[in-house]
A protein has these predicted regions:
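Binding-site signature for planar aromatic cofactors or substrates
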Residues: 1-188
């Protein structure tokens, strides 16, 4: 059954690298706020060390993860085996958002894939790793990645993406600020 570790082991990193899908969960401090759970793919995440992961975060209609990280930093990642031996792997930690133009952008961007529509990088320091059986996770065949988001971003172009982010990504659904919103406020 489940085991707990204080770092990402080599076998955990290898398992993570094989998964075409992961989930990231965050929540605001307000008990009435909305918990967020987002599926992510596109081979966007990398294990950077035994206690750090990062992923490229694409432009989307919401920016809940970033707002929650700005408020409290709490983050959980989950990876599931949909084929092969059953396994669920969770990474618990504290995350932050890095925007293009931030001092440490290049240090992280150079270690991650370049994807059209990238709006920010999410970096997390991991302090707990937990495995569980995964016996109830169904078998599923991976077909291929969806290209829709990359195609949309390429068609829209960077200037239009910036405008879109300023319209859609500055506040959470619970009206929390995001780093994009804070940066925009400092500019104006």
């Amino acid at each position: 059954m489940g085991k707990v570790f204080d770092h990402i082991r080599e076998e955990d990193a290898a398992f993570i690298a094989r998964q075409p899908l992961f989930f990231v969960a965050t929540a605001p401090l307000d008990a009435d706020g909305h918990v967020n759970l987002s599926p992510k793919g596109m081979d966007a995440l990398r294990v950077l060390s035994a206690d750090e992961v990062a992923y490229v975060d694409m432009t989307g209609s919401g920016n809940e993860t970033s707002a929650h990280l700005l408020e409290n930093g709490r983050v959980t990642f989950m990876f599931c085996a949909f084929n092969g031996a059953p396994n669920i792997l969770r990474l618990f930690g504290t995350g932050r958002t890095i925007l293009p133009g931030d001092a440490d952008w290049s240090a992280y961007a150079d270690r991650l894939p370049t994807l059209p529509g990238t709006r920010q990088i999410i970096v997390a320091s991991i302090d707990r790793v937990q495995t569980s059986c995964g016996f109830a996770v169904p078998y599923m065949d991976y077909v291929k990645p969806r290209e829709t988001l990359c195609d949309w971003a390429e068609k829209k172009g960077e200037d239009a993406l910036v405008t879109y982010r300023h319209e859609k990504n500055v506040r959470s659904i619970d009206d929390l600020p995001t780093p994009i919103g804070e940066a925009l406020a400092q500019e104006g």
